[in-house]
């Protein structure tokens, strides 16, 4: 009969144990870091969402940091961890507002077709303002607080930037009359500013929507280099 040979289980080497512990340690650190980042983003977004609702309902001046923190269910210390002051938070709220408008326009506009895109951006911008009027912070409240330079800087990331890019492309393709490009960009973006300023006059915007669009299209046609 066969002789029975006892099995000897190999014991892990000391350095293998250290490697396993090291991997577990760094994995724990990364998981904790990811969790902290998620909490950071969540708290930031909660503050912005809460502030935007309160600014729309009551106006910027009537809302306190305590009230914003309370609505966001965070401490006042958490507020100051994310924002230096209420002014900085207003900038973040305005930026979020433009992000939502920009997303709406982008899904409905073919930005590769210059002339058509300029028409579409304006028309869908007008639609969004009319449909979401009651949920927007008036630009008249934003501009005096954050200042024109900050307002323009934020706007350039979204609608204003898109309009400027299209105008630059049309100029390169010699589709525009020989006007100064800065003048053209400022005038075109002035249409959007006009709508934003008069956003609270909802009835007038809705009733005269067709006229706004017709005049805007006529203005665009006058710029074409035939």
Predicted regions and their residues:
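Amphipathic alpha-helical packing segments from all-alpha helical-bundle domains
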Residues: 99, 148-173, 182-186, 210, ...
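Hydrophobic alpha-helical segments that form the core
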Residues: 124-125, 177-198, 211-219
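Amphipathic alpha-helical segments used for helix-helix packing
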Residues: 129-149, 197
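Short hydrophobic/aromatic patch on the recognition helix
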Residues: 73-83
């Amino acid at each position: 009969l066969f002789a029975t040979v006892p099995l000897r289980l190999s014991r892990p080497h000391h350095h293998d144990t250290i490697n396993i512990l090291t991997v577990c340690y760094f994995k724990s650190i990364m998981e904790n870091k990811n969790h902290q980042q998620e909490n950071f983003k969540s708290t930031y977004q909660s503050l912005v969402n809460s502030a935007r609702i309160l600014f729309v309902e009551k106006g910027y001046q009537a809302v306190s940091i305590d009230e914003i923190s309370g609505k966001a269910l965070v401490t006042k210390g958490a507020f100051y961890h994310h924002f230096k002051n209420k002014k900085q938070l207003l900038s973040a709220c305005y930026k979020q507002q433009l992000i939502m408008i920009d997303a709406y326009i982008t899904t409905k506009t073919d930005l590769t077709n210059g002339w058509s895109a300029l028409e579409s951006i304006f028309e869908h911008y007008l639609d969004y303002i009319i449909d979401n009027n009651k949920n927007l912070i008036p630009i008249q409240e934003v501009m005096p607080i954050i200042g024109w330079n900050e307002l323009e800087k934020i706007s350039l990331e979204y609608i204003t930037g898109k309009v400027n890019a299209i105008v630059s492309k049309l100029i390169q393709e010699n589709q525009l009359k020989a006007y100064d490009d800065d003048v053209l960009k400022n005038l075109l973006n002035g249409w959007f500013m006009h709508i934003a300023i008069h956003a609270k006059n909802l009835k007038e915007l809705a009733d005269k929507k067709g006229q706004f669009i017709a005049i805007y299209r006529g203005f665009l046609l006058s710029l074409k280099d035939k």
